[in-house]
């Protein structure tokens, strides 16, 4: 495995095989493939970590890898199931008073085992893939409006999910390195 700048690194953690996006794919295929690549990156950053490591913050930030994973599960479900399809929130999100505790998913992730967090995220991603596959196309608008009554196209939602997941994959890079010195893609 290589580290920064293509040099071999003894500090690289085991990375699951990630699917490279097909450069000849359609717009819809590329958006889905780039999102999957980022999802796989985030999951790889949690490989081999125990509950204490997943819940360990690295000051001055309060972020944890477990919190990021739980947050990304919420983001997947919220954008594609709740906003795009108009479905009600699933548990545990449905019972949360977000006004009183806006960082609930970050705070409560420490109570869950690493595999529970990974499984929740994988299941949310699987359901998201199904929503995208069953949509009429990238121009299909969300059922639930937001921001002054505006509705979101599936294209916008996928781009937003790529941006959000990639941003948190970058956070996960730093968090993982702070935990055990591992670096990698």
Show which residues each predicted segment covers:
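Short, contiguous alpha-helical
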Residues: 4-9, 14, 18-21, 25-47, ...
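Acidic/histidine-rich alpha-helical segments that form the ligand environment
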Residues: 101-141, 155-161
């Amino acid at each position: 495995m290589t580290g920064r700048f293509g040099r071999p690194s003894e500090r690289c953690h085991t990375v699951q095989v990630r699917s490279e996006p097909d450069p000849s794919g359609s717009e819809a295929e590329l958006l889905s493939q780039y999102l999957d690549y980022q999802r796989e990156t985030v999951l790889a950053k949690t490989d081999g970590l125990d509950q204490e490591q997943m819940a360990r913050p690295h000051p001055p930030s309060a972020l944890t890898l477990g919190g990021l994973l739980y947050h990304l599960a919420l983001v997947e479900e919220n954008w594609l199931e709740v906003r795009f399809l108009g479905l009600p929130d699933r548990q545990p999100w449905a019972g949360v008073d977000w006004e009183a505790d806006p960082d609930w998913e970050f705070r409560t992730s420490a109570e869950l085992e690493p595999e529970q967090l990974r499984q929740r995220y994988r299941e949310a991603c699987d359901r998201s893939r199904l929503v995208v596959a069953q949509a009429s196309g990238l121009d299909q608008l969300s059922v639930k409006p937001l921001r002054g009554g505006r509705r979101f196209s599936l294209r916008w939602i996928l781009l937003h999910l790529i941006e959000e997941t990639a941003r948190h994959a970058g956070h996960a890079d730093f968090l993982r390195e702070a935990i055990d010195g591992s670096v990698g893609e």
